[in-house]
């Protein structure tokens, strides 16, 4: 029997409600695949502020570091809005990424056939299929480069610096190509190499890394063209590889194409496959504890965890298939409900997925 320690951070708002369902699903998967998951619950975000006076206690970092992966619910809420920046719940996410060395953000965007009416795009575009993954470099680039504000010739002037070295590009490129090997074996690297030196280094390095993955088809697009192509023909994309700032923008654009944010998972990973997995939606404190939140993004985050951190691809496919089956049978939580479908609560949705595993 395989055994894995999983750090669990329920967090704030609906976090505990949806994490509960994901843990339930993983436990069932463990029974099916002769695997034992040892879940260790720790605090971060507002939950940790209330308990310890800080958003990211040392105990949480230590437990995460000694685990195979981290399953996170959601952090934040208006209750803590008046705290200074460094003490706010959201600082826990930045702190965890830094402490755990998570440099690659993986954001899938998939339109389920039965939910395509939620997409803002025309049916003829969606009908071609949308199932892509944005791989974004997370801890380099312009967000972390030299910056400042100063007077130049008597005029207030601000600057930020886009900077990458070869090693930083190599490691994120490897993450993208490895992800593509699990998917349709196609990588689109996105840059602005017609203007930026940093992008020219990016493109040159990605080309070098691609030689190690002869099965994967590589293409390059400028970021402005990519933004256009995402709404014109999203079916052309499998894995999109890009830097921090471009990925920040493109991953949000891709998520909006689906029209159902409650369905979208994400992960932040590093070279050894360790990662932190969470839904992209917020903590929605107004519906916390009411059994109406959609747990599917959290359940799909657990599927990503099993695929990318535990090398349990078959189990991940099982979970994804169970989710799709429940949707095809017409079950919906309030956020994706339309007339003619069957509305269910958080716990019942989790049970429905469980039954179909």
UniProtKB/Swiss-Prot annotation:
Instruction: List, alphabetically, the PANTHER family matched.
Output: 3-ISOPROPYLMALATE DEHYDROGENASE (PTHR42979:SF1)
Q: Which family does it belong to?
A: Belongs to the isocitrate and isopropylmalate dehydrogenases family. LeuB type 1 subfamily.
Instruction: Name the UniProt key words of this record, in alphabetical order.
Output: Amino-acid biosynthesis, Branched-chain amino acid biosynthesis, Cytoplasm, Leucine biosynthesis, Magnesium, Manganese, Metal-binding, NAD, Oxidoreductase
Please give the GO cellular component terms listed in this UniProt entry: cytosol
Broad EC category: oxidoreductase
Principal subcellular localization: cytoplasm
Binding, Mg(2+): 224, 248, 252
Per the UniProt record, the source organism is: Clostridium pasteurianum
| Recorded catalytic activity of this chain's protein | (2R,3S)-3-isopropylmalate + NAD(+) = 4-methyl-2-oxopentanoate + CO2 + NADH
Q: In which pathway does it act?
A: Amino-acid biosynthesis; L-leucine biosynthesis; L-leucine from 3-methyl-2-oxobutanoate: step 3/4
GO molecular-function term, one example from the UniProt record? NAD binding
User: Where, in this chain's numbering, is NAD(+) bound?
Assistant: 77-90, 282-294
The molecule here is called 3-isopropylmalate dehydrogenase
């Amino acid at each position: 029997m395989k055994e894995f320690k999983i750090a669990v951070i329920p967090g704030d708002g609906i976090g505990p409600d949806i994490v509960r369902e994901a843990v339930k699903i993983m436990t069932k998967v463990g029974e099916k695949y002769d695997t034992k998951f040892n879940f260790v619950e720790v605090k971060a975000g507002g939950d940790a502020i209330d308990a310890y006076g800080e958003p990211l206690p040392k105990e949480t970092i230590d437990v995460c570091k000694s685990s195979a992966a981290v399953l996170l619910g959601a952090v934040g809420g208006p209750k803590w809005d008046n705290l200074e920046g460094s003490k706010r719940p959201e600082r826990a996410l930045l702190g965890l990424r830094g402490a755990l060395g998570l440099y690659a953000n993986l954001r899938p965007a998939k339109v389920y056939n039965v939910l395509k009416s939620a997409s803002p795009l025309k049916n003829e575009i969606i009908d071609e299929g949308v199932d892509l993954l944005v791989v974004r470099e997370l801890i380099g680039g312009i967000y972390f480069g030299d910056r400042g504000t100063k007077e130049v010739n008597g005029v207030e002037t601000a600057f930020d610096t886009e900077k990458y070295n070869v090693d930083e590009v190599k490691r994120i490129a490897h993450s993208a190509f490895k992800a593509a090997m699990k998917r349709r074996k196609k990588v689109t690297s996105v840059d602005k190499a017609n203007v930026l030196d940093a992008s020219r280094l990016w493109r040159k390095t990605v080309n070098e890394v691609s030689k190690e993955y002869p099965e994967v088809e590589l293409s390059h697009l400028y970021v402005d063209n990519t933004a256009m192509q995402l709404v014109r023909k999203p079916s052309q994309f499998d894995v999109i590889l890009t830097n921090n700032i471009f990925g920040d923008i493109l991953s949000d654009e891709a998520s909006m194409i689906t029209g159902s944010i409650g369905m979208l998972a994400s992960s932040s990973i590093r070279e050894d496959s360790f990662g932190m997995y969470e839904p992209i939606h917020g903590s929605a404190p107004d519906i916390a504890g009411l059994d109406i939140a959609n747990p599917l993004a959290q359940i799909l985050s657990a599927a990503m965890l099993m695929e990318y951190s535990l090398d349990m691809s078959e189990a991940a496919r099982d979970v994804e298939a169970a989710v799709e089956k429940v949707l095809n049978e017409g079950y919906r939580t309030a956020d994706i409900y339309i007339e003619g479908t069957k509305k269910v609560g958080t716990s019942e949705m989790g049970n429905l997925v469980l039954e179909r595993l």
